[in-house]
């Protein structure tokens, strides 16, 4: 029988980085699919706020906005659940951008300007 595989790419996931209902849906759906025998992987940005023992799986350059950004794919072992992967890039997801969503207005920029840049890179 064919093994189904699902990759879920999201900005939030309960237990790691959650602000609203999206984080609940991503985790609960991933857990249920895994229980149903589906091979599930969840991919998130590696925000600085995430406390996980992840290991580097690959490093590569991502072309974005006319530049190349060194980026690392990391992995966390989860027993009996979805595989967890993170896209780690310091400029977009660490330091002052280490939370899920950023209030750009406090930086004198337009609403959601920083999030638009961060998630365009992530996509």
Predicted regions and their residues:
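N-terminal subdomain of nucleotide-sugar transferases
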Residues: 1-80
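A conserved catalytic-core segment of Leloir-type glycosyltransferases
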Residues: 46-123
């Amino acid at each position: 029988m064919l093994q189904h595989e699902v990759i879920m790419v999201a900005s939030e996931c309960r237990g790691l980085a959650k602000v609203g209902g999206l984080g609940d849906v991503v985790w609960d759906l991933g857990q249920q699919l895994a229980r149903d025998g589906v091979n599930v992987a969840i991919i998130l940005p590696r925000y600085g706020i995430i406390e996980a023992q992840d290991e580097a799986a690959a490093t590569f350059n991502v072309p974005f906005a006319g530049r190349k950004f060194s980026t690392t794919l990391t992995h966390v072992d989860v027993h009996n659940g979805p595989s967890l992967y993170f896209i780690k890039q310091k400029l977009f997801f660490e330091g002052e951008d280490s939370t899920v969503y950023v209030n750009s207005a406090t930086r004198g920029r337009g609403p959601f300007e920083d999030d638009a840049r961060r998630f365009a890179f992530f996509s």
